[in-house]
Amino acid sequence: MRLLPLLVGFSTLLNCSYTQNCSKTTCLPNAKCEVHNGVEACFCSQGYSGNGVTICEDIDECSESSVCGDHAVCENVNGGFSCFCREGYQTATGKSQFTPNDGSYCQDIDECSESSVCGDHAVCENVNGGFSCFCREGYQTATGKSQFTPNDGSYCQESMNSNCHLEHACIAANINKTLKRIGPITEQTTLLQEIYRNSEAELSLMDIVTYIEILTESSSLLGHPNSTTSYKDAHFNSTLTEFGETINNFVERSTHKMWDQLPTNHRRLHLTKLMHTAELVTLQIAQNTQKNSQFDMNSTDLALKVFAFDSTHMKHAHPHMNVDGGYVKISPRRKAAHGTTGNVVVAFLCYKSIGPLLSSSDNFLLDTQNDNSEGKEKVISSVISASISSNPPTLYELEKITFTLSHVKLSDKHRTQCAFWNYSVDAMNNGSWSTEGCELTHSNDTHTSCRCSHLTHFAILMSSTSSIGIKDYNILTRITQLGIIISLICLAICIFTFWFFSEIQSTRTTIHKNLCCSLFLAELVFLIGININTNKLVCSIIAGLLHYFFLAAFAWMCIEGIHLYLIVVGVIYNKGFLHKNFYIFGYLSPAVVVGFSASLGYRYYGTTKVCWLSTENNFIWSFIGPACLIILVNLLAFGVIIYKVFRHTAGLKPEVSCYENIRSCARGALALLFLLGTTWIFGVLHVVHASVVTAYLFTVSNAFQGMFIFLFLCVLSRKIQEEYYRLFKNVPCCFGCLR
């Protein structure tokens, strides 16, 4: 009984908040009746406002402009509203209709993610709420416009002015247009994705040139992350991969037909810019890594490898790269720095098919099919790049770089060389192959090994003008060195003989003496300085000295021929007058030729290969021309002398058989061949038609010319034998040999 009041009170409390259907009150259709504390009342449904009895008006939620958020349209309906994304936008779930209370919002649709959205020969540019299509250079729509949207039925077709890409003004205009279009992009990843996406499709010549310029102009942005923090491993790898694939798109084999349309100097300019930018950006990206790392990427026509390490790991780091059957390795001067801390980045790039683009031929597509093209140097290997960036710069200094590269094709009949692409950052249009600072250590038919003292882009060159194989070339080099050393010794003995033996002094020995002096100096300078090509000024001076001394030697050979002719024919001459003119002709005329040549083309003295005259603009003929003239004169004199001597010998000694006369004349003729320099005719033949036979004949006969002169003028001369006998007769070790 005591609990009854509590139950009654609790029941009353429940009735105050209990709602039930109305029985007396009538509400509008958009309202509902509810009972509260025993009182009936009408309430408008959600989305309506009013008293529920006489009025229930729809609430216009769309009157608040921001109710659906950005890039959305609000649509009011009875009792509510719906949000619709504008064209070009959608929610994260891919829907176009939503209500904001579920957390959805509209974001831009990247229509350009579908590569074919604009059709062939077009580039897609994504913008907020849509996209635009641009025809590539050389193409336009039927209306002549370059910009369009595909839903209007437009597409890109070849322009009537499709040769515009060959004009500098057209190239510059397209570059400026593209720079203006992507100029607002200030984020590294976005810019890289934009360039990569546009390089994926089939590229025209204008596309290649334009985006190489974009890469060059944007190298500072591409090489640095979007914030001050370092790269995470995943971001570092993905960024380098995407950058490497972008470079690969510009140099892959399918683009070679486009590159062929550019003149050689323009082709080299843009390739130099591309290689320089690739090297620079790769180093910059790698400098922002968080820790010691290594990265590898291998695409169809480009391979990339990066080493990043700090000073504590230097002694364990061995930067190297295996490339297409080859190998490249960097050796630093020191592998550990005492008390110095810092970071080091080493980057290798291998361009697998870029070689033909950098060959000396104007039409490399045809040249690659012709192994016998004259006057060309062809790249027969991959082109590799090696670069170092250390902080501080002295932390990791280069001692040498060694590499072995496989040949693209066999080169058993050609000479190979180690070369690097020599260019200046301020003058990239002057890029060319050079051998300075590089040394060939080994070569066979399939591979060549090199050692260089600097870093840049390296390759193996094949000289297609040479018909001499590597083995023959090495043998000829050794023969030349040995022959010149022996000749120098023999010429020194000849000079001593003709200078100090008073009993044999005559006009003839004076000529012999000057010939031997000129030839001795020429061969000495050749032996010491022919390969000193590291310093252009020194190399030019050596080339000038060689030019003068060899011409002087030829001049005295000519004097030998003229003097012998005068003796044989029996012309009476004034010795004093003749001596004076001999010296003028022997030493002054070569000086005039060299001085005149130097005034016209001093830059042609010394080449990147050897310190000799350049073949450019036929400058080599400033030596070959006078030499050929002297050889011709001496050949005529040689013929007359042999004829006169043979007839004279046969007339004086009729009892001597014809065979003996011929034998005597043959021995004299052989002596004259070397004395008059007529053996140089083999050199002329080798220039006209190079062959292994002419190479060996020229090398042996002229490298040993000093030895032959010593044999015929000294050893086989009775007068000089007597002088040697008198000189050495009191020397016990020599007397027995001279008896």
UniProtKB/Swiss-Prot annotation:
UniProt-annotated stretches for the region GPS: 418-468
UniProt key word rRNA-binding: no
Post-translation changes: Glycosylated.
PROSITE patterns cross-referenced by the UniProt entry: ASX_HYDROXYL (PS00010), EGF_2 (PS01186), EGF_3 (PS50026), EGF_CA (PS01187), G_PROTEIN_RECEP_F2_2 (PS00650), G_PROTEIN_RECEP_F2_4 (PS50261), GAIN_B (PS50221)
Cleaved signal peptide residues: 1-19
SMART domains: EGF, EGF_CA, GPS
Domain GAIN-B: 293-468
Phenotype upon loss of function: No visible phenotype but deficient mice present increased cardiac hypertrophy in response to pressure overload.
Induction: Induced by VEGF and FGF2.
Extracellular topological domain: 20-481, 535-548, 603-622, 689-695
Origin superkingdom: Eukaryota
Domain EGF-like: 20-57, 58-107, 108-157
Site residues (Cleavage), renumbered to this chain: L455, T456
Keywords (A to Z) from UniProt: Calcium, Cell membrane, Disulfide bond, EGF-like domain, G-protein coupled receptor, Glycoprotein, Membrane, Receptor, Repeat, Signal, Transducer, Transmembrane, Transmembrane helix
Predominant subcellular localization, coarse grouping: membrane
Localisation per UniProt entry: Cell membrane
Listed transmembrane segments: 482-502, 514-534, 549-569, 582-602, 623-643, 668-688, 696-716
Residue ranges annotated as Cytoplasmic topological domain: 503-513, 570-581, 644-667, 717-739
InterPro entries (UniProt xref): EGF-like_Ca-bd_dom, EGF-like_dom, EGF-type_Asp/Asn_hydroxyl_site, EGF_Ca-bd_CS, GAIN_B, GAIN_dom_N, GAIN_dom_sf, GPCR_2-like_7TM
Quaternary structure annotation from Swiss-Prot or TrEMBL: Heterodimer of 2 chains generated by proteolytic processing; the large extracellular N-terminal fragment and the membrane-bound C-terminal fragment predominantly remain associated and non-covalently linked.
Family (UniProt): Belongs to the G-protein coupled receptor 2 family. Adhesion G-protein coupled receptor (ADGR) subfamily.
UniProt domain comment: The transmembrane domain is not required for cleavage, but it is required for dimer formation.
The protein's name: Adhesion G protein-coupled receptor L4
Species assigned in the record: Mus musculus (Mouse)
